[in-house]
């Protein structure tokens, strides 16, 4: 009897990354100084980080200046596509660039199986928890500036997924896809 190949789910999303993780507002008990507080008022620079993850691996992490628009989404899909197999299914949220005409046109010519999450359901997207974990790690290390952040990006993402990927996916109610 022929067995169908097992489907492997990937979850994709983007997040904003700032080059200054130091808080600009803080509280302390009356009479005590605030520790680790940056009194300078600077405008942190923003970049967008986009990637896909499975329970075991991170796919096509990419960081760029500005926000995600259809052209950037298309570039990312072009980077991601060579890493995909026919049994992969990419799950995305409903951000506007994910549904753009350019993206739909590309997908018509270069089939990638995509499912969209229901509206307003970030709790169903494991990569949201990966983004929270990476940002927490960078804050704890007090890394500042994009060169320092990006130098550790690939290793940090892979390390978090290798250590906690299955738990992250299961925490989003996808435990049945892990077996």
Regions found by a protein language model. Name each.
Residues 93-94, 101, 115-136, 147:
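RNase H-like two-metal-ion nuclease catalytic core shared by retroviral integrases
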Residues 27-30, 108, 132-135:
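Short, hinge-like loop/turn segments at secondary-structure boundaries
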Residues 70-117:
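RNase H-like DDE/DDD metal-dependent nuclease/strand-transfer catalytic core used by mobile genetic elements
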Residues 5-9, 127-179:
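C-terminal anion-handling pockets and recognition modules
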Residues 21-25, 102-104, 127-129:
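Short aromatic-enriched loop/helix-cap "lid" or pocket-rim segments at secondary-structure transitions
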Residues 13, 51-52, 77, 93, ...:
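Generic structural signal for small/hydrophobic residues in well-ordered secondary structure
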Residues 34-42, 110-126, 143:
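RNase H-like polynucleotidyl transferase catalytic core
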Residues 1-78, 171-174:
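Extended, low-complexity cationic-aromatic segments
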């Amino acid at each position: 009897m022929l067995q169908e190949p097992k489907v492997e789910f990937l979850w994709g999303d983007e997040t904003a990354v700032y080059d200054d993780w130091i808080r600009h507002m803080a509280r302390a008990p009356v009479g005590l100084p605030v520790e680790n507080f940056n009194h300078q008022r600077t405008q942190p620079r923003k970049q967008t980080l986009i990637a896909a993850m499975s329970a075991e691996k991170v796919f096509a992490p990419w960081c760029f200046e500005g926000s995600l628009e259809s052209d950037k989404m298309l570039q990312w899909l072009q980077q991601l596509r060579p890493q995909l197999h026919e049994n992969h299914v990419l799950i995305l949220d409903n951000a506007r660039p994910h549904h753009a005409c350019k993206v739909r046109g590309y997908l018509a010519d270069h089939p990638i199986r995509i499912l969209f999450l229901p509206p307003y359901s970030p709790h169903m997207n494991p990569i949201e928890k990966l983004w929270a974990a990476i940002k927490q790690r960078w804050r704890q290390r007090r890394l500042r500036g994009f060169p320092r952040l990006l130098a550790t990006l690939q290793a940090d993402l892979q390390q978090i997924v290798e250590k906690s990927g299955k738990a992250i996916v299961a925490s989003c109610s996808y435990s049945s896809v892990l077996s």
